Amino acid sequence: MLAFAARTVVKPLGFLKPFSLMKASSRFKAHQDALPRLPVPPLQQSLDHYLKALQPIVSEEEWAHTKQLVDEFQASGGVGERLQKGLERRARKTENWLSEWWLKTAYLQYRQPVVIYSSPGVMLPKQDFVDLQGQLRFAAKLIEGVLDFKVMIDNETLPVEYLGGKPLCMNQYYQILSSCRVPGPKQDTVSNFSKTKKPPTHITVVHNYQFFELDVYHSDGTPLTADQIFVQLEKIWNSSLQTNKEPVGILTSNHRNSWAKAYNTLIKDKVNRDSVRSIQKSIFTVCLDATMPRVSEDVYRSHVAGQMLHGGGSRLNSGNRWFDKTLQFIVAEDGSCGLVYEHAAAEGPPIVTLLDYVIEYTKKPELVRSPLVPLPMPKKLRFNITPEIKSDIEKAKQNLSIMIQDLDITVMVFHHFGKDFPKSEKLSPDAFIQMALQLAYYRIYGQACATYESASLRMFHLGRTDTIRSASMDSLTFVKAMDDSSVTEHQKVELLRKAVQAHRGYTDRAIRGEAFDRHLLGLKLQAIEDLVSMPDIFMDTSYAIAMHFHLSTSQVPAKTDCVMFFGPVVPDGYGVCYNPMEAHINFSLSAYNSCAETNAARLAHYLEKALLDMRALLQSHPRAKL
């Protein structure tokens, strides 16, 4: 569930004039305090939108039944009104009525493994090195780049991002470094060490399943240079050549309850506990991966996507991870690189902004060779593996192997056009792509489905996401008409434009805090908190259908030619992520092999055809030039 963001225009901090007089530490707080609070939408408005969103995806009988339940729910003096008042009270008392609830329900209480089910991966452009020297040089430069970005976080001088002229909440940037998820028996927690009395000065480096603590600052507080980091990485590489080590990191890929039990067993031992604490506190992790088996160029991208998302299995690089760590950069000897991140801390856009910065940084030449001062040996993190822990590792390996075999992932570069074409037609590129997805899905399945697209709520203090529902009556009318020979081309163009505009309108409402999904979730959680019986509208078939997202999608734009990916959120669904570049579009599509009805490559094929057909339709009927 990643965050949609229209390309945020970054302007410098300057909308609150007295900043030049303030200490840096109060700058971020002043910006955050000036942001509006997330509103609770009017009850009737959300319920009307809910009923409207159900029309394309449920039968007329189901819809009529739900309409009755909605009318009862919102009756004067009824349960809906009481819950709405409770939510409004919560909004007055908290900084954001949703953020804590969302963190818990979407992430910390979610018991499936973070791998595939929750943590997104990112594939960066293949680098031009093909050997160990190149791998370590690039990793060193990347580390230096992240530390350079960290200066802006530490000094609170990150340029504020704007969306449609409105400043955005920058809090997520302050959660992604020196943080880690910690498993718990029913609910996990996230520990952030960046604001402690002694903030961490080390990163974690993993090679051949062996973890190292690498200090990246000198005693005077200055960061190590890329040359110095390179020397340290060489030391790490040379002292971890054994390949018979137990992949302790694979424990973090297991079901959260199983991992919580194994975690408690693991940290009973002081040596293990100290090693785990070092990983949790580190600023971020760098995984020096073994090269994946060679494959043909067209399969290469999808293989690397798997490597970034899950490591490729216990025989390859899955043991080279600590999946609870918020940020893990991955660099392999063959030039493939990317990252995987734990989702509780942030959505895609802040991660991608950091990546854009770091990738630009890695292209800078080293102007001066830095002096090679003697540096201490990086500390190897030891683990005492008891038979019980070994058994936990074996179980985690088996579970991960099943998950990896079940994942069907395809990365497609759509070369025919990028955001340039929809823009030339005065259409939103995001809405255009979403309508192509609706068309592709309809052509395969002959029906519309509940579709989730992430909308950023960062216009509000501590805002995370809400849902843009891409399946509408407008989109359904368009996709039905597209292959109907009785509908004229001119009518099809009008229906396409109308569907795109409707999606654009929904997006605008969602980022202003007026979508209904999080509001309904809030009402449901309020009912649980008030210990009242669950209202019928939440026990209804229509609600179950509406929340079963066969298409879970996200636009994550970047300046870098990269793509993000994640697994489907339902067993019979798809995960679709895309980065629209100027003249091409990067897509990732995922499904599960255990579902006979879904196939990622087939959806990719139909999506490509839908995009081309929509372009041909618009080109055959040029807009009248005003």
From Swiss-Prot:
It is an enzyme of class 2 (transferase). InterPro entries: Carn_acyl_trans, CAT-like_dom_sf, Cho/carn_acyl_trans, Cho/carn_acyl_trans_2. It comes from the Eukaryota. Keywords: Acetylation, Acyltransferase, Endoplasmic reticulum, Fatty acid metabolism, Lipid metabolism, Membrane, Mitochondrion, Mitochondrion inner membrane, Neurodegeneration, Peroxisome, Transferase, Transport. GO terms for molecular function: acyl-CoA oxidase activity; carnitine O-acetyltransferase activity; carnitine O-octanoyltransferase activity. (R)-carnitine binds at Y452, S454, T465. The keyword Endoplasmic reticulum applies. The modification N6-succinyllysine is found at K93, K261. Changing T465A: Increases the KM for carnitine almost 70-fold and reduces enzyme activity 450-fold. The modification N6-acetyllysine is found at K261, K268. A motif (Microbody targeting signal) lies at residues 624-626. It is found in: Endoplasmic reticulum; Peroxisome; Mitochondrion inner membrane. GO terms for cellular component: cytosol; endoplasmic reticulum; mitochondrial inner membrane; mitochondrion; peroxisomal matrix; peroxisome. Mostly in skeletal muscle, less in heart, liver and pancreas, only weakly detectable in brain, placenta, lung and kidney. Changing R518Q: Increases the KM for carnitine 230-fold and reduces enzyme activity almost 100-fold. CoA binds at K419, K423, S424, E425, K426, L427, S428, P429, D430, S456, R504, Q555. Its EC number is 2.3.1.137, 2.3.1.7. It is a peripheral membrane protein. Pfam families: Carn_acyltransf. The active site is at H343. It catalyses: (R)-carnitine + acetyl-CoA = O-acetyl-(R)-carnitine + CoA; propanoyl-CoA + (R)-carnitine = O-propanoyl-(R)-carnitine + CoA; butanoyl-CoA + (R)-carnitine = O-butanoyl-(R)-carnitine + CoA; hexanoyl-CoA + (R)-carnitine = O-hexanoyl-(R)-carnitine + CoA. Catalyzes the reversible transfer of acyl groups from carnitine to coenzyme A (CoA) and regulates the acyl-CoA/CoA ratio. Also plays a crucial role in the transport of fatty acids for beta-oxidation. Responsible for the synthesis of short- and branched-chain acylcarnitines. Active towards some branched-chain amino acid oxidation pathway (BCAAO) intermediates. Trans-2-enoyl-CoAs and 2-methylacyl-CoAs are poor substrates. Monomer. It is linked to Neurodegeneration with brain iron accumulation 8: A neurodegenerative disorder associated with iron accumulation, primarily in the basal ganglia. Disease onset is in early childhood. Clinical features include speech delay, progressive cerebellar ataxia, unbalanced gait, and loss of ambulation. NBIA8 transmission pattern is consistent with autosomal recessive inheritance. This is Carnitine O-acetyltransferase. The gene is CRAT.
